[in-house]
Amino acid sequence: MMKVLVVFALLVTLISYSSSEGIDDLEADELLSLMANEQTRKECIPKHHECTSNKHGCCRGNFFKYKCQCTTVVTQDGEQTERCFCGTPPHHKAAELVVGFGKKIFG
C-alpha cells in the first residue's frame, strides 16, 4: 500500500510540474500580447487631439473607442479645410451615462 501512495504522489508531482510549465508558456504569450497592445495604445491619438491625418487611430475610452469627428473650417481667406479630432459620439455618451447611472444605483 505504501508503494502505491509513493507512486501516486510522484505522478501528481510530475503532472503538476508539467502543467505549470505549460502555464508559464501561456503567461509568456499573454505578456507579449499585452506588450504589443501597450505599444499600440501609446501610438493612438488621445481624446480631443487632432486626427485629420489618421482617422482610424483614436484611442479607447472607458467603454468605446473614440471616433474621429470632422468638421469643415473656413479660413478668413475663404479657403475650406477639414479638421478632425478624436471624441465620443453622442450615442456613446448616452450609453456611458446610462451605464454610470446603473452602477451608482446597483452598486
From Swiss-Prot:
One of its GO terms (molecular function) is toxin activity. GO terms for cellular component: extracellular region. It is found in: Secreted. Pfam families: Toxin_35. Keywords: Disulfide bond, Knottin, Secreted, Signal, Toxin. Residues 21-41 form a propeptide. It comes from the Eukaryota. InterPro entries: Spider_toxin_CSTX_knottin (IPR019553), Spider_toxin_CSTX_Knottin_CS (IPR011142). It comes from Lycosa singoriensis. Its main location: secreted. The presence of a 'disulfide through disulfide knot' structurally defines this protein as a knottin. Residues 1-20 form the signal peptide. This is U1-lycotoxin-Ls1b. Expressed by the venom gland. Disulfide bonds join C44-C59, C51-C68, C58-C86, C70-C84.
